[in-house]
Amino acid sequence: MCSSDLRRAVSDIGVLPGHLATAVLGLNEAQLDTPYRPEGWTVRQVVHHVADSHMNAFVRLKMALTENRPGVSAYDEKKFAMLGDTQLPVTVSLELVRSLHARWLAIYGTMTETDWQRTFIHPEYPEPLTLDWQVQMYGWHSRHHVAHITALRRREGW
């Protein structure tokens, strides 16, 4: 990844906590429990999914930085989205994401060019994944899910 792509991805991860909080600001319980698309997750589930997904990514980052090509586990995000913790107030996951991203950025700030090339093995991908790939993917993931919520708000006039 070129340095401008890397900077953008790190920036996207850095601003996600604020963007996600703003995206759900002022929504009532019924709105939080509205799917962002037919057959899709509710806004509440999306917020909790971001926390789940980014926790997994953070642990994978730490493993890749401290182990030699570690294998990581896949998880069923659809099943995760159905567990009881996804009925909690979104503030629980918003605070988790805020704290997690502060730690994530602290690590990113200390990484060398060599660190960004470190890899981990994911069972759903045929090749090892680099940390520069991971940061770009989660920068996209951050924008992607905020856009789901903001598009729903525009459609519904919220």
Say what each PLM segment does:
Residues 7-10, 21, 143-146:
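Low-complexity, intrinsically disordered short peptide segments enriched in small/polar/basic residues
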Residues 14-40:
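A glycine-rich, hydrophobic loop/mini-helix early in the fold
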Residues 23, 27-30, 68, 111-114, ...:
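A short secondary-structure junction motif
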Residues 1-3:
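Short, small-residue-biased leader/transition segments that mark boundaries at the very start
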